[in-house]
Amino acid sequence: PSTPPLEDHSFDIAASLSALDDFGPVDKGTSTGGAVDVEAVFAKFKEGVRQQVAETDAQSHYDLGVAYKEMGLINDALTEFELASRDPSRECVCHSMAGMMHLEQGNLEAAIEAFIRGLHAEQKSADQELALYYELGNTYQLRSNPREALFYFQKVMRRDAGYRDVAARVR
């Protein structure tokens, strides 16, 4: 007996982008000089995404998070990473990504919270844990909390003294 072929339920970003062609022509008589309303285009794109991607499709939500991050759509990226983090195998990396975005925005408290959530993920590798300890040390250092920074940098040192510039940071 043959097994039925697996259905591909993954999100097709290219198809969704091509659906934007249905957005309609731009009214050349508007004061925008024929420019497309980018926010309206993205709103249509995101609506198409919501219709096509199940909340449980962690891979697609992760991929969308990465794409939105690269486009500078930080809030949308954070939402997608939060949805993708419901998959235990992606929880750590999603919280790490969220922490890095918060850090880039200068939101140190949110970065710390995200990194700690990553540490609490049940499924994480030793490398992921090491990176989170380092990022927590770095974030506490940026927050002018040298004691807490040293605590996390020392955790990194005990596991891998050659990790990044941790030896210099502990001195």
Annotate each language-model stretch with its function.
Residues 85-86, 120, 157-158:
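Conserved structural position within tetratricopeptide repeats
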